[in-house]
């Protein structure tokens, strides 16, 4: 699973997921998967979508993951009373804003890329769209 090697602080406040994305252009590949909806992706969801894509393109082409789960989510154990401090870190998430590029693919045809992204979208909890690199 994806998670930071080390962080300055173990736990983080909840915060809010507002605004639009900074990474809204394709930088590495020819095709991309862009988020339309706001949400958060766990490291398991990111890895599951990556596996689905890499299986569908059958070791041809290259995949880039453009999101990284750097926010820890804590959870208290079952049947524990409130209070006594914040719970332990349960999993890591990446906050997603509309317009963010999640994955990129290169060195495959457009039909294969569309099919791979369709499989990946089924694993993700947010709505996404297929985008091409703009060549000027």
Curated annotation (Swiss-Prot):
Record keyword tRNA processing present: no
Q: Name one Pfam family in it.
A: Ribosomal_L16
Read off the InterPro entries from this record.
Ribosomal_uL16 (IPR047873), Ribosomal_uL16_bact-type (IPR000114), Ribosomal_uL16_CS (IPR020798), Ribosomal_uL16_dom (IPR016180), Ribosomal_uL16_sf (IPR036920)
Protein name (record): Large ribosomal subunit protein uL16
Q: Which gene encodes it?
A: rplP
List GO molecular-function terms, semicolon-separated.
rRNA binding; structural constituent of ribosome; tRNA binding
| Top-level taxon | Bacteria
UniProt GO BP: translation
Q: Which CDD domains match?
A: Ribosomal_L16_L10e
Quote the subunit structure annotation: Part of the 50S ribosomal subunit.
Looking up NCBIfam families in the UniProt record yields: rplP_bact
Which terms in the GO cellular component ontology are assigned?
A: cytosolic large ribosomal subunit
Purpose of the protein: Binds 23S rRNA and is also seen to make contacts with the A and possibly P site tRNAs.
Q: Which family is this protein grouped under?
A: Belongs to the universal ribosomal protein uL16 family.
């Amino acid at each position: 699973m994806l998670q930071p090697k080390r962080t300055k602080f173990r736990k983080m406040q909840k915060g809010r997921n507002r605004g639009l994305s900074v990474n809204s252009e394709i930088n590495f590949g020819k095709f991309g998967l862009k988020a339309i909806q706001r949400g958060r992706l766990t490291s398991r969801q990111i890895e599951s979508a990556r596996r689905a894509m890499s299986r569908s393109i059958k070791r041809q082409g290259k995949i880039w993951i453009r999101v990284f789960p750097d926010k820890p989510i804590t959870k208290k154990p079952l049947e524990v009373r409130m209070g006594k401090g914040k719970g332990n870190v349960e999993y890591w998430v990446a906050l997603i804003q509309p317009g963010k590029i999640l994955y990129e693919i290169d060195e495959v045809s457009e039909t294969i890329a569309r099919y791979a992204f369709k499989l990946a979208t089924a694993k993700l909890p947010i709505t996404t769209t297929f985008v091409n690199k703009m060549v000027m």
